[in-house]
Amino acid sequence: MDYNRLSLEMHETHHGKIAVAPKVKVENRDDLSTAYTPGVAEPCRRIAADKQEVYRYTAKGNLVAVVSDGTAVLGLGDIGPEAAMPVMEGKALLFKEFADVDAFPICLDTKDVEEIIRTVKFLAPTFGGVNLEDISAPRCFEIEKRLKEELDIPVFHDDQHGTAIVVCAGLLNALKLVGKQMAEVNIVINGAGSAGISIAKLLMRFGAGNIVLVDRQGAVSVDESWLNPAQRAMAEVTNKQNERGPLTEIIKGKDVFIGVSAPKVVTAEMVSTMASDAIVFAMANPTPEIMPEEAAKGGARVIATGRSDHPNQINNVLVFPGIFRGALDARATEITEEMKLAAARAIAAIVTDEELREDYIIPGAFDKRVAPAVAQAVMDCAKAQGVARA
């Protein structure tokens, strides 16, 4: 199917994908006086006396801001705030469809870190959570870090953490299938940007001890001068053997390849140099680092991509609806690392041992069990950690 043409027609026909819908009817004078003036003054007074009452009397508790500056949109790059709108609308649509979370796109006409932080802080009283989206690295790290420190609502950069959570969920099951342990496998992550770094961090929390990050210029190593601050910090805690060189060398002998990089950078011959029962997660979109049939030709046993037309789709839609549903229902002040681990385990657990096979290591995007399971795990974790207010 020609999805480009169909998408253009959809967006033109509907003038976007989302709209504001009323929860109550205003059909007569009494309705008007209750929904607006004079009756509306009473909830205003209650909230003025106790700001936490805003969760009781307004939509804040189920409302998420989808914030972008349009600098890292899909594979399109820095296309600006207006051109980012269809993606942010799409994100809001998925929030609603998969977890009944109301979300609103906010595309900012600035690339300045301080301006973005200040703007989101000004908007925060309206929202129960903030989903950062398609903001380029390394600025995205500072923006998220500061907002998490300065706001008392969940802030979540989905390009980092959503990707990391679903990768970890898939890898937990893939390793179970091939009979290998997280602490023992050798992992190469191609793409040392926001997603690759976040994947590495979460894998380490799951016990991974042997990770090498690779970027365009080669392995991320403490001896390299080209590293940005985020990459340099990762060099200190990964690549313990101080491997150097291009991906073609680094991939040799590895048990796991995780790609969040560019199309067609891996060949069947490269996969053939990996360890036996190799696991290949090639997630570049729309064209992966290696097509599944080529990875299989190279000897990979478990293969996943970011595409819906192949088995084992590694898709963030398995994560962000449920993680925000749980955080909002708990009225959490933040999304902690432990909540991310809980989300990954919940996704992995959807696939039972009896169901687990090479072409089914992760639930499908439309599996209705996923969002509720993630939400419950996240909510339970928030309460156990003392970051819940509900």
Region roles according to the model:
Residues 74, 81-99, 157, 161, ...:
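Glycine-rich phosphate/diphosphate-binding loop of Rossmann-like nucleotide-binding domains
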Residues 69-71, 79, 108-109, 134-137, ...:
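Short, ordered loop/turn segments at secondary-structure junctions
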Residues 1-155, 375, 381, 385-389:
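N-terminal ligand-binding/catalytic initiation module
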Residues 12, 55-60, 96-97, 122-124, ...:
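Solvent-exposed alpha-helices and their adjacent loops that cap or buttress functional pockets
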Residues 158-159, 181, 282-390:
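Adenosine-phosphate binding glycine-rich loop
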Residues 105, 131-134, 155-158, 189, ...:
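General beta-strand structural signal in soluble alpha/beta enzymes
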Residues 232-301, 307-309:
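Rossmann-like adenosine-cofactor binding region
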